[in-house]
């Protein structure tokens, strides 16, 4: 997939990074990778933003790696995403039935329309051809972006327990008994 590349130099890169992160929140799907100034010998960027989903794959663990390989072969472009722990169920003869309140897919990857890399004071925009006319406008918008102020609230947070306190203590006591017997280790 062809991308248009434009490079800009930015004086106040930390401000730009903060503006970029806030600017990205208008999109439903984003990946934000930030080294947090940790220096590595082979790093090709300090920060990367992938956003504005063009194509994606979302699947359960069954044949997840085969589906990902097919998606990657068809896309022939940058893809970003995650592989959940439960994908192991297709690789090994294992199974887990852990509670999943968030209901994430077992595997999700997407092809971004917009990619922005920061290295030092250099900012590179890698946009798909269909949106490359937005590079200059986006750059200016990010530069001028006013960070929203977050209002503090004093409302109490209510946490709903999944198990009762007594049941939790009972499970911990059983686990500690196993540790003391040497059946399992910390």
Regions found by a protein language model. Name each.
Residues 1-186:
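Signature of the chorismate-utilizing enzyme
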């Amino acid at each position: 997939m062809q991308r248009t590349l434009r490079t800009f130099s930015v004086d106040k890169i930390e401000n730009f990074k903060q503006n970029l992160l806030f600017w990205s929140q208008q999109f439903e799907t984003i990946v934000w990778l930030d080294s947090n100034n940790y220096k590595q010998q082979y790093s090709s960027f300090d920060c990367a933003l992938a956003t504005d989903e063009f194509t994606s794959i979302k699947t359960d663990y069954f044949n997840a790696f085969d589906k990902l390989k097919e998606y990657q072969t068809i896309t022939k472009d940058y893809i970003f995403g995650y592989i959940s722990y439960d994908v192991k169920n297709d690789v090994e003869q294992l199974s887990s039935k852990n509670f999943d309140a968030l209901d994430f897919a077992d595997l999700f990857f997407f092809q971004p329309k917009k990619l922005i890399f920061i290295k030092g004071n250099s900012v590179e925009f890698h946009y798909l051809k269909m949106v490359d006319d937005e590079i200059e406008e986006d750059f200016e918008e990010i530069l001028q972006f006013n960070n929203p102020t977050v209002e503090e609230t004093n409302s109490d947070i209510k946490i709903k327990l999944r198990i009762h306190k007594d049941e939790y203590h009972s499970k911990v006591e059983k686990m500690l008994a196993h540790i003391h017997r040497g059946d399992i280790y910390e």
